[in-house]
Amino acid sequence: SAGEVLVKTLACGICGSDLHALRHGHEMVKSQKETGGPLVYDASRDLIMGHEFCAEILEVGSGVPDHLTSGDIVCSMPVLVRSDGVHTIGYSNEFPGGYAEHMLLSSQLLLPVRNGLSAAEAALTEPMAVGRHAVEKSSATGDDVCLVIGCGPVGLAVIAALKQKGLGPVLAADFSPRR
């Protein structure tokens, strides 16, 4: 479609939400339907997850800006914007995510990967953005003790964002003894 690019996945992270959907997909879809959430798919049908990804542009469609070309390395928000609405990538029976070899992305949502960042590092853009967003939404000030419960990838991203903003001290706790 116009404004879309075909990409080849270079790296894709495994999110806790993917694991939750794998084990509890039917309950997740039911909850989304009841609350008007965006993750409404048929959990009894196949889907290809993966929303933490880095990819290489293979082909550009009509209406794609000239600065985006084949061979560019990009990240993107995990949604596809079309004339009939916004479609979730990965949590969809029709729009595969980053665990697929190829996928379609909306050109207006692409973020070029620069400065020699590896594909594996760039695939962390989404969880790092979630952590930063959480800190931006908080009312934490330099005088606050910040508590982060959960030290998985997003929890670590929150800790990094807190430290980047000069907030803290930061206390972190996790139920997993491995963390």
Where are each of the predicted segments found?
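Glycine-rich beta-strand-centered segment in the early N-terminal region that forms part
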Residues: S1-C12, E27-L80, R114-G116
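Short cysteine clusters
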Residues: C15
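NAD(P)H dinucleotide-binding glycine-rich loop of Rossmann-like/cofactor-binding domains
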Residues: L39-H51, V74-I149
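Hydrophobic/small residue at the entry helix of a nucleotide-binding pocket
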Residues: V130, V154, L162
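Conserved S-adenosyl-L-methionine
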Residues: Q164-P169
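Conserved SAM-binding motif I beta-strand of class I
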Residues: A172-A173
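Conserved SAM/SAH-binding beta-strand->alpha-helix loop
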Residues: S176
